């Protein structure tokens, strides 16, 4: 990293960042492979040493500019065992390295700006978790009856993304290469819906797309920082840029800036005395104190502003005025709402006693049962009605591997949806996975589910059927006496940094 910093010379205030030559450096691709993402499919050949040579990179660029970019003959496949028959490998390798290179000016300039201002950077692993959103919603959104549910649109033209990066990167060669990538391999569906990947780009190329998407979204989100400074009574507290998370964390008294990881996972929090803003993936929520008329004015103020100054075509129907007390809010894999929680308090003064009825707003979260059953049905764990079926592709595995894979999916779902106010829907999902596992094992041994479990015993599924109480008792052995009460309440785990698509579980 020091070598990259010396090359860019970002400490000079008006230094142009010539990033294009970095594409030909071997260590760039080594660093891109070591940033926590599973790229083992690129390295299936044991003879490959996890690096790209200068000659290979030059050949990749040459092949991409040829007429048939993705065509590989059988002779070439036999001569080069590393590339094989993967038609997406050429743009895939360059895309990974190019995304890593584009992130350098953002991260390094952020470090330098914080160092100049002598701000203390606090690294907090808890803020990385997706679950950290929901305590924020519980503390603030329960007081707001109306929120704006916003579906973030895509830029109307690809050139807008290039123009956005021109403010950060002054290297014309890199921008030309970026423009080539966008027009040749771009697919917007792969951004908003990762499971609908482009035919020319696999899911390994989402890093470049998410980086461009978040850099563009951060541009129009800057309006909230401006509005916050205009409306806040504490204008002395400065506010920084809203960037992605992992390296840099700074917390100010009236403002929370969450810097997320490598522009990969979309999450921004902005805390203001009058306005609250949350974004996750392609959806954002804006809440403010006021009447429905006031929120409607916000809607018709922001839409023309974003369209005129940021070229974002916000259709009015993509911004909904949601009353949380009557409608559910779909956000972050949960269905959320605000309901009145009535409680009766008995008070006694001397010889007189009386009852006080108290009602407070409570922010509830529920498991979206229909979308989850749809995902399980697409992954062939059940049919569209939720009836468990056997998983044919796993019948060739050992019994322990089958139980482990089903159990891992069940534990991941239970882990993420542990914040649900009601567990009935979660129990149904776990029942589908358990019975699907039993049917898969019975089909492998050519038996019925009842006969199979009776012959081998229920201890075969002991690890798979482990309850949350047992998991918590293993995690917190000293607090076993109070686990029963904790289990009934919602639990937010601050170690969840990504979601796994069930459809891709094999």
From Swiss-Prot:
Its main location: plastid. GO terms for biological process: mRNA processing; RNA splicing; tRNA processing. It is found in: Plastid, Chloroplast. Coiled coil: none annotated. It comes from the Eukaryota. InterPro entries: Domain_X, Maturase_MatK, Maturase_MatK_N. One of its GO terms (molecular function) is RNA binding. Keywords: Chloroplast, mRNA processing, Plastid, RNA-binding, tRNA processing. PANTHER family: MATURASE K. Belongs to the intron maturase 2 family. MatK subfamily. Usually encoded in the trnK tRNA gene intron. Probably assists in splicing its own and other chloroplast group II introns. This is Maturase K. It comes from Jasminum nudiflorum (Winter jasmine). The lineage of its organism: Eukaryota, Viridiplantae, Streptophyta, Embryophyta, Tracheophyta.
């Amino acid at each position: 990293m020091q070598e990259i910093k010396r090359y860019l010379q970002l400490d000079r205030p008006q230094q142009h960042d010539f990033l294009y030559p970095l594409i030909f450096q071997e260590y760039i691709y080594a660093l891109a492979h070591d940033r926590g993402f599973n790229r083992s499919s690129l390295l299936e050949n044991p003879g490959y040493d996890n690096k790209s040579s200068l000659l290979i990179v030059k050949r990749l660029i040459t092949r991409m500019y040829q007429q048939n970019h993705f065509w590989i003959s059988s002779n070439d496949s036999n001569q080069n065992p590393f590339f094989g028959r993967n038609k997406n490998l050429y743009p895939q390798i360059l895309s990974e390295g190019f995304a890593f290179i584009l992130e350098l000016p953002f991260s390094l300039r952020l470090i330098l700006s914080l160092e100049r201002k002598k701000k203390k950077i606090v690294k907090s692993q808890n803020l990385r978790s997706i679950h950290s959103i929901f305590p924020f919603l519980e503390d603030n959104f329960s007081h707001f009856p109306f929120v704006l549910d916003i579906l973030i649109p895509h830029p109307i033209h690809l050139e807008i993304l290039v123009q956005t990066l021109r403010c950060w990167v002054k290297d014309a060669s890199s921008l030309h290469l970026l423009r080539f990538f966008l027009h040749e391999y771009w697919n917007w569906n792969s951004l908003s819906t990762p499971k609908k990947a482009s035919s020319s780009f696999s899911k390994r190329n989402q890093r470049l797309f998410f980086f461009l998407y978040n850099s563009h979204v951060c541009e129009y989100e800057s309006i909230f920082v401006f509005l916050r400074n205009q409306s806040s009574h504490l204008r002395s507290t400065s506010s920084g840029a809203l960037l992605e998370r992992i390296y840099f964390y700074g917390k100010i008294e009236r403002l929370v800036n969450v810097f997320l990881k490598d522009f990969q996972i979309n999450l921004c929090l902005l805390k203001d005395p009058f306005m609250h803003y949350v974004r996750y993936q392609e959806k954002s929520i804006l809440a403010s104190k006021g009447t429905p008329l006031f929120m409607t004015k916000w809607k018709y103020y922001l839409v023309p502003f974003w369209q005129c100054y940021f070229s974002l075509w916000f259709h009015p129907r993509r911004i909904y005025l949601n009353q949380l007390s009557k409608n559910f809010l779909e956000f972050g894999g949960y269905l959320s709402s605000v309901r009145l929680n009535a409680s009766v308090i008995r008070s006694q003064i001397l010889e007189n006693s009386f009852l006080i009825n108290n009602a407070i707003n409570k922010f509830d979260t529920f498991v979206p049962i229909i979308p989850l059953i749809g995902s399980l049905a697409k992954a062939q764990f059940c049919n569209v009605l939720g009836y468990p079926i056997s998983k044919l592709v796993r019948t060739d595995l050992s019994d322990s591997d089958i139980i482990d894979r089903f159990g891992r999916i069940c534990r991941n779902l239970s882990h993420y949806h542990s914040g649900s106010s009601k567990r009935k829907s979660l129990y149904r999902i776990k029942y589908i996975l358990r019975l699907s596992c039993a049917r898969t094992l019975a089909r492998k041994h050519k038996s019925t589910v009842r006969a199979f479990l009776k012959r081998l015993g229920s201890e075969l599924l002991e690890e798979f059927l482990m309850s949350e109480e047992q998991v918590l008792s293993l995690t917190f052995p000293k607090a076993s006496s109070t686990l029963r009460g904790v289990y009934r309440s919602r639990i937010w785990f601050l170690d969840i940094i990504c979601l796994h698509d069930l459809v891709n579980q094999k």
